């Protein structure tokens, strides 16, 4: 406990109620550090200040607490709902469990008539009308399923704007992954059948599809339509190949199976997804927890995950440990998602198979993570020896632009648990001389540390010049930051980097030094993060700049044009009559656009 705050905290604890409710822990400047819920506020909050607390994250939290506020509720369920609402609203740093909190990936079948599209994306976009299937454990697994659907049923996956402006079939048709509805090479009736079959496939109804394909293949063979028979034979082979890879269980229904494991300071939660009796796969999470009790940790994870990250919750959650507040958690989830939800620990038969599979996967995942964890810890340890001070959090900046165009600065964050992707930041750099990397870095550092705490190590991708500029920024902000500049070697060859320190000294580590490997890993991630955003910004700006010279064509109409034709290339290829089809463009403006673009 912070010595300066001890008298105040002890007074608060002495007068605290034993009713259920929510507690908020505040820092020196009143900033919200952590939100928690309790069945008994006095007992729960007091437990943070006992001498036996050993968890590093809890110790770090307690050291920063200067004040505690409480809100009494009528029940523990009400407290849980309020806790999750406050976390969602304020995002306190010590409530952050997941380093990467991307939402679920779904496959989406649109309701566009007469030619729906199939695509994948994160979350159930409320602006989209259609059917969603999933969740899928990763974008890769969703794309893999889409590829199978393309090969089986040839349903389009292109954007509506691209679809609308096609005049001839695209490459997808040439490689037999689309039936080219854009140019009328398939009737709406036949296309609808392909869409319906795609939906049946996504719902797991592959047995009937199998029988239908056999019947069509035999019918085509009897009619001596051998090319058609071969087409159905190939589809049948692909479908059977997919069926062989899928785990399909006898019972239908939906469930998430969650297994937790804790070993050597690493917590892992494995989630397996079952929908319509099909195992869709699973994903491993490595949350930062404040507890060492497996049941409490899994309960906290479930509350955080389904309230803060997931778009849906299935009717069953199967867990591998008993949860201390199972009933309250069920009630809170039912209130949030407006459906009956059961959390089960002791299960039999098929559900026991699911549970066993999740346990096997969590044990495998934690072994792999421990191996990575040990390697990363060793890299951090060797880096600490090189710089002569403790290092837990590293932040690294990089600048990306093309001849001064669309300049982007990136900031990536690593700690001894790995990359903290939810702490990454990107800065669009404006109002500087084109190509001035020093000014770009100055602006990014100022914007980052005007309100944020400096890390244990600030890595600057650049040599002495960039480092001196960073020192000036920190001096202006009145901050004491430990910084190291990283300059590339001859020919920009990896392994020849030089580290520059603020006292003017510099060192070159051996190519196989683990500290150098860590620095390269962080720097390369900063470069990747910057250049990805830069390219997107540059391409968007270039697409718009061609249209900006057209008088009377404002931002909204430019955006409508690009959306309608699927990009600047589509606009350039469009005729006057096609331009007139864009909403809000009359004959005069269409003529002007065409004339200027084709002069």
From Swiss-Prot:
Molecular function as annotated in GO: DNA binding; excinuclease ABC activity
InterPro entries the UniProt entry points to: GIY-YIG_endonuc, GIY-YIG_endonuc_sf, GIY-YIG_UvrC_Cho, RuvA_2-like, UVR_dom, UVR_dom_sf, UvrABC_protein_C, UvrC
Annotated UVR domain residues: 207-242
Key word Membrane present: no
Organism superkingdom: Bacteria
Domain GIY-YIG: 18-96
UniProt keyword annotations, A-Z: Cytoplasm, DNA damage, DNA excision, DNA repair, Excision nuclease, SOS response
Function description: The UvrABC repair system catalyzes the recognition and processing of DNA lesions. UvrC both incises the 5' and 3' sides of the lesion. The N-terminal half is responsible for the 3' incision and the C-terminal half is responsible for the 5' incision.
Subunit and interaction comment: Interacts with UvrB in an incision complex.
Protein name as catalogued: UvrABC system protein C
């Amino acid at each position: 406990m912070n010595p300066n705050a001890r008298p105040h905290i002890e007074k608060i604890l002495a007068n605290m109620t034993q009713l259920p409710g929510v507690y908020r822990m505040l820092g020196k400047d009143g900033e919200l550090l952590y939100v928690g819920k309790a069945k008994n506020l006095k007992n729960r909050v007091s437990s943070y200040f006992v001498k036996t607390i050993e968890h590093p994250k809890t110790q770090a939290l307690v050291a920063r607490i200067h004040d505690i506020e409480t809100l009494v509720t009528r029940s523990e369920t009400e407290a849980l709902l309020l806790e999750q609402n406050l976390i969602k609203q304020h995002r306190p740093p010590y409530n952050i469990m997941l380093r990467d909190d991307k939402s679920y990936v779904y496959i989406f079948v649109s309701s566009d008539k007469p030619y729906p599209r199939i695509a994948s994306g994160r979350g159930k976009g409320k602006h989209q009308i259609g059917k969603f299937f999933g969740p899928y454990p990763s974008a890769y697994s969703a794309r893999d399923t889409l590829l199978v659907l393309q090969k089986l049923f040839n349903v389009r996956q292109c954007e509506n704007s691209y679809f609308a402006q096609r005049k001839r079939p695209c490459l997808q048709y040439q490689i037999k992954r689309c039936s080219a509805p854009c140019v009328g090479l398939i009737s709406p009736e036949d296309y609808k059948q392909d869409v319906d079959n795609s939906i049946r496939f996504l719902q797991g109804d592959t047995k009937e599809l199998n029988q239908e394909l056999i019947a069509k293949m035999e019918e085509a063979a009897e009619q001596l339509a051998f090319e058609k028979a071969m087409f159905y034979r190939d589809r049948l082979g692909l479908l059977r190949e997919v069926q062989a890879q899928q785990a399909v269980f006898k019972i239908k229904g939906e469930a998430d199976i969650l297994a937790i494991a804790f070993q050597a300071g690493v917590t892992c939660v494995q989630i397996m997804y079952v929908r319509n009796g099909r195992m869709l796969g699973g994903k491993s999470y490595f949350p930062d927890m404040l507890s060492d009790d497996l049941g409490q940790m899994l309960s906290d994870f479930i509350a955080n995950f389904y309230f803060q990250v997931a778009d849906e919750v299935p009717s069953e959650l199967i867990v591998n440990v008993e949860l201390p507040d199972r009933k309250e958690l069920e009630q809170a989830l039912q209130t949030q998602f407006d459906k009956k939800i059961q959390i089960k620990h002791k299960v039999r038969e098929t559900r026991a198979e699911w549970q066993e599979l999740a346990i096997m996967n969590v044990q495998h995942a934690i072994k792999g993570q421990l191996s990575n964890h040990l390697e990363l810890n060793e890299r951090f340890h060797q880096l600490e020896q090189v710089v002569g001070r403790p290092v837990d959090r590293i932040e690294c900046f990089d600048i990306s632009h093309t001849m001064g165009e669309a300049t982007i600065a990136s900031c990536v964050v690593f700690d001894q648990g790995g990359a903290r992707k939810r702490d990454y930041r990107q800065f669009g750099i404006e109002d500087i001389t084109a190509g001035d990397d020093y000014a770009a870095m100055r602006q990014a550092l100022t914007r980052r540390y005007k309100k944020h705490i400096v890390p244990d190590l600030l890595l600057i991708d650049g040599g002495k010049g960039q480092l001196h500029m960073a020192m000036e920024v920190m001096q202006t902000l009145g901050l004491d930051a430990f910084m190291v500049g990283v300059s590339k070697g001859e020919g920009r060859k990896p392994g020849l980097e030089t580290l520059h320190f603020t006292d003017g000294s510099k060192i070159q580590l051996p190519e196989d030094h683990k500290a150098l490997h860590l620095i390269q890993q962080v720097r390369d991630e900063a470069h990747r993060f910057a250049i990805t955003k830069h390219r997107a910004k540059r391409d968007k700006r270039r697409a718009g700049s061609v249209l900006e010279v057209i008088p009377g064509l404002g931002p909204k109409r430019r955006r409508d044009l690009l959306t309608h034709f699927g990009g600047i290339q589509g606009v350039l290829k469009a005729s006057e009559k096609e331009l007139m089809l864009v909403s809000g463009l009359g004959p005069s403006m269409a003529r002007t656009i065409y004339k200027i673009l084709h002069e």
